[in-house]
Every structure is written in C-alpha cells, then in structure tokens.
C-alpha cells in the first residue's frame, strides 16, 4: 500500500468488512507494527516510534465513545490532559484560571451545554457528549494528523449527525489533515475533499476534487464491483447508502 496525504487533506475511507480500513489506522497510530516500508509525517520516519510517542503528532477518535476520555476525571481535567499533550509535565497548581476560560469557550462552541458542567465527571455524560468531547480533545493541540475510526457509528442518527457536523467544522476551520473511516457512503461523498476505497488491504480507488463531488452511491458500488470482482453483499455499507 502507498498513500500520500497533502496538508489539509480530509480523506474519507470506505470499503467492505475486513478491507483493512481500521488496520491501516492502527498501523499509522502505532498500535500494530508494520512488516515493511515506512510511515512518515512531515518527512520524519515514525515507523519505529511507539504509540505513546506518535500521540504527540496524531489525534484519534475511536468508534467506542468510552475510549479517548477518562471517565473518573472532570471534563476540565480531561481537557487539561489533552492541552498538555507532548509537553513535559511537572508539579504545578493544576488548572489555571485562564485555561478554564479557554476550555469554557471551546466547550460553548460544541453547543451541548458542557461549558456549564466543567466540574462534572466525564462518566456522567451521554455517548454523544463524550464523543464530541473526545473530538475536541483530539484537536486541541492541532495534530499533524487526525484519525477518525467510524467515530459516529455507535451513536443514534441525530447525535451522529451532530458529531459529524462538528467534525467537518473543526477539520475545515483548523485546516487539519484527517483520515475518516466510515460505512456511510453518502457521508463519504459529502464530507472532505478526497475519498479512497479499500479492498483486501489495498487502495482500489482514489478520487478528489470535482470528480469526488460529482460521485453518487451507485458510482461507488459500481466502482467496487469493477475493481474487486464482487459486490457489497451482506455488508453494513448497503445499510448506510
């Protein structure tokens, strides 16, 4: 596999079950080692760096809303941890007043009322609220790469749409480089500036710009059948078109 991302690329990733989408993200993040080749960010080879070191450059939001936050800590404490990602840590006075004001402003933009619950434990939040908070935390220090692994799949449709809209807004406003795995083909077409389709661990289709904007779900189904010699039989993608 060979994949190059340009600065500011917002790439949606689709493919059948077992196509290798999540595996690709896990290799980039350092969860799985690569057998050969290399992974570079801004020309720096990070292939041998452990996951915790890559976290300095890479933000990530998982499918499970329970991941990405510390349930037993307050909202503001979670944000403080994310704010200090990649920094040396020592003894201090905790969260400073100006930090609280900053977190309050950021939480207000989410439109979920979390700015009024900064002292609440994260474990008391709904799945959608936790996922929105995780997204905010993942982008707090503007990562060089944001990985989104079906991060709306476990949410109800209304909440999923809210989180997806927030995602699009944050990535666009901050000009982030992002990879978003999704099973929803409509979202894959409408969100981002580039789309890649995977099958059996390979990228079989890579489209961007106006060509992507003009795509339809039927085009994607036909492209998959053409490239793979099969169809999305019994696949969740058929339920999300």
Model-derived segments and spans:
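ABC ATPase NBD coupling module
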Residues: 45-59, 67, 89-92, 96, ...
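Conserved ABC transporter NBD signature motif
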Residues: 37-45, 205-207
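The feature captures the beta-strand-to-loop junction immediately N-terminal to the Walker
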Residues: 14-16
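ABC ATPase C-loop
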Residues: 138-139
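Q-loop/switch helix immediately C-terminal to the Walker
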Residues: 73-85
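ABC ATPase nucleotide-binding domains
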Residues: 212-241
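H-loop/switch region of ABC-family ATPase nucleotide-binding domains
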Residues: 182-183
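Helix-to-loop junction immediately C-terminal to a conserved catalytic motif
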Residues: 29
């Amino acid at each position: 596999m060979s994949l190059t991302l340009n600065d500011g690329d917002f790439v949606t990733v689709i493919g059948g079950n077992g196509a290798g989408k999540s595996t690709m993200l896990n290799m980039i993040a350092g969860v799985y080692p690569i057998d050969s080749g290399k992974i570079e960010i801004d020309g720096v080879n990070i292939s041998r760096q452990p996951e915790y070191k890559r976290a300095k450059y890479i933000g990530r939001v998982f499918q499970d809303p329970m991941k990405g936050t510390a349930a037993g800590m307050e909202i503001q404490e979670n944000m403080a941890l994310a704010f200090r990602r990649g920094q040396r840590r020592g003894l201090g006075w905790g969260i400073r007043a100006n930090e609280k004001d900053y977190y309050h402003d950021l939480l207000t933009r989410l439109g979920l009322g979390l700015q009024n619950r900064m002292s609440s434990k994260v474990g008391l939040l709904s799945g959608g609220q936790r996922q929105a908070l995780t997204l905010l935390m993942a982008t707090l220090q503007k990562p060089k790469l944001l990985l989104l692994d079906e991060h709306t799949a476990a949410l109800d449709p209304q909440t999923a749409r809210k989180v997806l809209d927030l995602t699009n807004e944050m990535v666009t406003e901050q000009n982030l480089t992002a990879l978003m795995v999704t099973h929803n083909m409509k979202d894959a077409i409408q969100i981002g500036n580039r789309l890649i389709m995977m099958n059996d661990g390979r990228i079989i289709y890579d489209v961007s710009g106006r060509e992507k904007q003009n795509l339809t779900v039927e085009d994607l189904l036909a492209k998959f059948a053409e490239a793979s010699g099969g169809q999305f039989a019994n696949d969740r993608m058929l339920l999300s078109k």
